[in-house]
Amino acid sequence: MSQRRQIGAVGAVVAVAILTACTAAVGGVSTSGDPQTSQGTNTTAPTPYGESDLPTDEPTGSPSRSDSPNPVPASSNKKIKRTFQVKTKDPVFFITIDDGNTKSPAALEYVQKHNIPATVFLTNASVAGQWDYFEKFAAQGGSIENHTMSHKSLTSASTPLAYEICRPQEIYAQEYGRVPTMLRPPYGNGGYSTTTPKRRKEIDAVASSCGIGHIVMWNGLAENGKFRFIRGALSRGDIVLFHFTPTLSGELKTVMEMAKRRGLRPAPLTDYLK
C-alpha cells in the first residue's frame, strides 16, 4: 500500500445523491461529434436520463485492502447542493465516469496519455479488489467520489441510506487517503424534482452527516458510443456522464475531439464545486 493510502481516512460526511434513469427527449450526437438534433434547452433541471443499473449478478460489496477501515467522524450538517452543470466563464467541461464494472486498459491508457482529469463516481460493488486501477484513472488531477455501496436507488424505502452513502466514505478514505465530497445517486433518484420532499430531506441529512457537500447530476451523456446533450452540443460548464464500459476509450476520444472543435478543455470538478 502506498504511503498516501496509509494516511487513513480523514473525517467525512455521508452524502446521498439521487439520479433517475429515464430516457430524455434530448438531441442525439453521433460518435463523430456532430449534433443530430437540438431539442433540450433547460440547463438547470434537465429531464433525467442516462443511468444504468449494475448487472444482476454484481456482488454487493468489494473487500477493502485494509483490514480495519477508519470510521468517518460525524461533522456538522450543511446544505447539499445539486448541480446539473457548472456556471463558469472558463472554457471547460467535466468528464465524470460512473460505476466501475469494466476496467479497460485502453481507457486508462488514454486518460494517462492525454492527462485527462476524470471524476470517478465509484460504486464499491464494482471494484472487485482492483483499487489501483481507479487510483491511476483519477491521478491526472481528477478525484474519486461516491456512487454508493451497491447501486441501490436512494428513493426506495428499503434502501439503508447510511450504509449506501456513508460506508463508501469510510472505505474510500482508507483506500485513497481522501474523503469524497460529491455523491452521484444511482439512477439520479433523489436529484430531480420527482423525489418527494420527505425523502429528499432524508437523503440530504445522511449525506451531509458524512462529508458530502454536492449531489452531482449531469446534462450530457455518453452511451454505447453516442452522445446526447441537453443544450444540443457540448458546451461550457457541461457535466458529461460516462460509464466504465467497453466503449469508454472510444467515447473519451470522441468527446475530446468535440471539445477541441469547440475550444473547450476538461477540468477537475473539484476545482469548481467547493
Regions found by a protein language model. Give the residues of each.
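Active-site beta->alpha N-cap acidic-glycine motif
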Residues: 61-161, 171
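N-terminal export and membrane-targeting signals
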Residues: 1-14
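Hydrophobic residues in well-ordered beta-strands that form the structural core
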Residues: 120, 146, 216-217, 268
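Residue-level detector of anion-binding/catalytic polar loops
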Residues: 117, 143, 213-214, 265
